[in-house]
Amino acid sequence: MTVTNNEIAREFAERLLAIEAVSLSPDAPFTWASGLHSPIYCDNRVTLSDPQTRDLIADGLASLVRTNFHQVDVVAGTATAGIAHAALAADRLGAPMAYVRSVPKDHGRGNQIEGRIPAHSKVIMVEDLISTGGSVLKAAQAVEREGSTVVGVLALFSYELEKGHRAFEKAGVPLYTLSNYPILIEVAAESGRITSEQQATLATWSSDPQAWSDAH
């Protein structure tokens, strides 16, 4: 997994913390829907409510595309979390935009892809948050079944989990993110939001979330 611009990564991490899109609580962990205990909770929907953060997302995602891809025909968001961010990026790039449902609709035309992705298009997928990568890679498969090529995935933030690393490597799809978990906890420590001891505790989580959860 790749973050191509460390300055943007640190700035975006600071914004996520400042607007409380990300909360860190190593001493009183959150419980995820899966039942896992986690020291981090990320709600990137909050970013849409802050104009400064939206601008940073739009500019950052567009920069990732221009820097890393020779040709992009369509920007496609994952439903629902990636739709708004895909629209921001597509607008900056002057590119067509579509979105991909997790499953086809059970009525009407039964579409899984909404909007137009012509056959043989080179497509960038946009997701808000990467944990294992399963959702966005499943959406990418739907795009490729229709005859286009997913050339990469962009996301706002990644937990940098080993399971996610393996999934993207197996799929052969490059991932670029605006920021990630190691950078975020570093910024949080430097800004005094967490202690050095808490930073050390947080650093152990991403290497084995299940073991961390079991111990907390």
UniProtKB/Swiss-Prot annotation:
Family per similarity comment: Belongs to the purine/pyrimidine phosphoribosyltransferase family. PyrE subfamily.
Keyword rRNA-binding appears in the UniProt entry: no
Gene Ontology BP annotations: 'de novo' UMP biosynthetic process; pyrimidine nucleobase biosynthetic process
Pfam family, one: Pribosyltran
Molecular function, one GO term: orotate phosphoribosyltransferase activity
Protein name, as recorded: Orotate phosphoribosyltransferase
Reaction it catalyzes: orotidine 5'-phosphate + diphosphate = orotate + 5-phospho-alpha-D-ribose 1-diphosphate
Originating species: Cutibacterium acnes (strain DSM 16379 / KPA171202)
Keyword 4Fe-4S on entry: no
Binding positions for orotate per the UniProt entry: 131
EC main group: transferase
Role summary: Catalyzes the transfer of a ribosyl phosphate group from 5-phosphoribose 1-diphosphate to orotate, leading to the formation of orotidine monophosphate (OMP).
Domain of life: Bacteria
Needed cofactors: Mg(2+)
